[in-house]
């Protein structure tokens, strides 16, 4: 039997989210919201209601909450499913790796931009968990 060799190409920076576990993508969104949007995460809310949101975070002044939802693969997110959370000043942050969003208004139901999150990751590599850094440093 002859040895077979296959040429592989190094993944591009733009492919990072496709390589990561869903939990890692959620971690990136959590860090982004805490650092860039200045939210504080209620860690006890992580996985309380996984069907609707990933966790609950609060604005630093306590005036409103945010409810992020993250989908990997080719899944899309529809803002109408989250309208009940986006009341009384509360916000919903949606992130789909596919970037397929419907019914988002940009005010209290917000679709996060993949390129912006990638830029965040690469400018904050030192804050990323080890599993994510392994992919970045490949």
Regions found by a protein language model. Give the residues of each.
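Mixed-charge (Asp/Glu-Lys/Arg
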Residues: 1-138
